[in-house]
Amino acid sequence: VDVFGPNASDAEELQARVNVGEKYNSDMFVSLHINSSVNKNVGGFSTYYYPKTDNDLRLAQNIQNKLAANFGVDDLGVRQANFYVIKRISMPAVLVEMCFISNEKELTLMKGQWFQKKTARLIAEGIEKYFA
């Protein structure tokens, strides 16, 4: 089955992501995304979790707190969600929405290398705090 190609279903592609995390017996799973909205004024960071372990919410809070405190964009908070990859994987997992591609200000931010590096560093700091 071509799980990453044009013939793969959404479920096959999502399950392939879960399989990678499970294959390597990961301690946690972080799925990174860029959000979009028909409302061009909506923006901000959000982190989603599914409460299948005692640590999903804590991981989400640690990452979201780092992101929210360091950028001039809206903090959309930590939210519970039923997303496939964070629900189906066995370890603590989060899905991070890093701003909105549909918001011109945030699109400009996301194109900057400094933003990409800082976002990666802040997510890593949230993960470090989770393990502390």
Residue ranges and their predicted role:
Residues N19, Y24, M28-N39, D74-A132:
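Active-site-adjacent mobile loop/cap segments within catalytic or ligand-binding domains
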Residues D54-R79:
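Active-site-adjacent substrate-binding region
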